Amino acid sequence: MTTLSSITVSVPATTANLGPGFDCLGAAISLYNRFKFSIADSAIEVKITVTGKEAPKVSTDRNNLAYQAFVKLYEYINQTPPCVLVEIDLGVPLARGLGSSATAIVGGLLGANQLAGSPLSQTEVMNLAIAIEGHPDNVVPALLGGCRLTASTSKGWVVCDIPWHPDIVPVVAIPDFELSTTEARRVIPTEYIRSDAIFNCAHLGILLRGLETGYGEWLQAGMQDKIHQPYRKSLIKGYEYVRSAALNAGAYEMVISGAGPTLLALTNSLTSSKVIAAMTGAWENQGVVTQVQALEINTRGAVFS
């Protein structure tokens, strides 16, 4: 077996929930963070360098999440982690609801697994990633690619690959302000009435068929939610204003991406440019600087180079 001394992992961003799929549904999209791990000869335990627009916000010591995941895998296989140089190139905005933490977890675990000689299977890496993150909706598509629905069973996690119709275009509006996942979770109730639970179950089923067929009426109906969005939207300035603009421009529906504050609209190639312009203008009218772009679904997941 050839022992690697360096490995680079490219991990896609993710948009989670898609409305009713709270903590269980997510899709990989075409924004990326890259993590390079190189075994070091020096006695320095870890040296981390970060590049990218938001690099100053990322920890460069042992508290770095990618490095913590790297160490966690070695602990899991009962080995001492090597001294390592970590180079991170950021392409996924931080604290925006695009799975930046999931990229770090997946990148760190995969980097460690490769340098350790691949002792863990992809499923074992996935299980460890879910355990670290606490929920599967971001880490699973970040690892595997595509749109994934994940559920826990008595035998472990079950992952379904959800077909995404090629005519459906995801448009993301990324604002210049952050929203912590902790704050976004704090406003969510701990208990729900039965009718709201039934509502989400029904609409998630409709959404999955809409994603598969590209049928606009199912997408519009399927993205409705009563579990998290009604409580989180108040944390996002101009949410209803931007949503109205997106729908008037032809989007099927607009939802919060992950914990927010990024907003996700699903549309098609005929209306995507109008939706982009409408969402940009609407948020700017609310005094929010935003980057709005049409992305693609990443079907490969995390890859090595």
Swiss-Prot record:
ATP binds at P93, L94, A95, R96, G97, L98, G99, S100, S101, A102, T103. One of its GO terms (molecular function) is homoserine kinase activity. Gene3D superfamilies: 3.30.230.10, GHMP kinase, C-terminal domain. It catalyses: L-homoserine + ATP = O-phospho-L-homoserine + ADP + H(+). It is found in: Cytoplasm. GO terms for biological process: threonine biosynthetic process. Signal peptide: none annotated. The keyword Secreted does not apply. Pathway: Amino-acid biosynthesis; L-threonine biosynthesis; L-threonine from L-aspartate: step 4/5. InterPro entries: GHMP_kinase_C_dom (IPR013750), GHMP_kinase_C_sf (IPR036554), GHMP_kinase_N_dom (IPR006204), GHMP_knse_ATP-bd_CS (IPR006203), Homoserine_kinase (IPR000870), Ribosomal_Su5_D2-typ_SF (IPR020568), Ribsml_uS5_D2-typ_fold_subgr (IPR014721). One of its GO terms (cellular component) is cytoplasm. It comes from the Bacteria. Disulfide bonds: none annotated. It holds the Pfam family GHMP_kinases_C. Keywords: Amino-acid biosynthesis, ATP-binding, Cytoplasm, Kinase, Nucleotide-binding, Threonine biosynthesis, Transferase. Its EC number is 2.7.1.39. HAMAP family: Homoser_kinase. Belongs to the GHMP kinase family. Homoserine kinase subfamily. Catalyzes the ATP-dependent phosphorylation of L-homoserine to L-homoserine phosphate. This is Homoserine kinase. It comes from Trichodesmium erythraeum (strain IMS101).
